[in-house]
Swiss-Prot record:
Membrane topology per record: Peripheral membrane protein
Protein name: Lipoprotein-releasing system ATP-binding protein LolD
Residue stretches making up the ABC transporter domain: 6-225
Keyword Membrane: yes
UniProt-listed SMART domains: AAA
Binding positions (ATP): G42, A43, S44, G45, S46, G47, K48, S49
Origin species: Nitrosospira multiformis (strain ATCC 25196 / NCIMB 11849 / C 71)
PANTHER family in the record: IMPORT ATP-BINDING PROTEIN, LIPOPROTEIN-RELEASING SYSTEM ATP-BINDING PROTEIN LOLD
Length: 225
């Protein structure tokens, strides 16, 4: 079995405007091993988010191959891809996507409850991860009662609570001030390292990208070093 957590070969993605094909990704090759931290940078509209969605099984490619833990996902149905995502991956987005009517504890426990974990055990795991991200004192607060940095920390906790093999992060600090962005980014690197998980992060900030183990540039539909 391959040691790669995520890999893709000759990955291609096009969209269509009527009969006109608009290519976005034109032959991406990428391997993400266990514990790797990879930053992907590129101009707005270069296809960074599209690539991340494909790597996470949230979209299907026009051509090429994607494997998550050696499972080829192109031939999977949506239910099978969803199960693989929930079991193997964590996601963090620029906007936290926390459910506003639920507390931080309830939001972070949600992925475990979706897995049908017992409520008490799910809450125990969520509480532990929230303490790790510095929110042990904010368990009963809703997203509206948290600061921007705290909401993003809760989103990081939610991504890590399932102990994923890899976290995919799409501009996770893009909505934060520079100091808070640096703190959240450092926290993600630290927690992923401690958990032995891989991290693929899309960012427009070259200073943050340089903290990753590997930085790749997406331009003209291709990844370069």
């Amino acid at each position: 079995m391959s040691d790669n957590i995520i890999s893709c070969r000759n990955l291609r993605k096009s969209y269509y405007q009527g009969q006109i094909e608009v290519p976005v990704l034109m032959g991406i090759d990428l391997k993400v091993g266990k514990g790797d931290t990879v930053a992907i940078v590129g101009a707005s509209g270069s296809g960074k988010s599209t690539l991340l969605h494909l790597l996470g099984g949230l979209d299907v490619p026009t051509g090429g191959e994607i494997r998550i833990l050696s499972h080829e996902i192109a031939g999977m149905g949506e239910a099978e891809r969803c199960e693989l995502r929930n079991r193997s991956l964590g996601f963090v987005y620029q906007f936290h996507h926390l459910l506003p009517e639920f507390t931080a504890l309830e939001n972070v426990a949600m992925p475990l409850l979706i897995r049908r974990m017992a409520k008490a055990k799910a809450y125990e795991s969520a509480r532990e991860v929230l303490q790790q991200v510095g929110l042990g004192h904010r368990l009963t607060h809703t997203p509206g009662e948290l600061s921007g940095g705290e909401r993003q920390r809760a989103a990081v906790a939610r991504a890590l609570v399932t102990r994923p093999a890899c976290v995919l992060a799409d501009e996770p600090t893009g909505n934060l001030d520079r100091r808070t962005a640096g703190e959240v980014f450092d926290l993600m690197l630290e927690l992923n390292h401690d958990a032995g998980a891989s991290l693929v992060i899309v960012t427009h900030d070259p200073d943050l990208a340089r903290k990753a183990g590997r930085t790749l540039h997406l331009e003209d539909g291709l990844l370069t070093v």
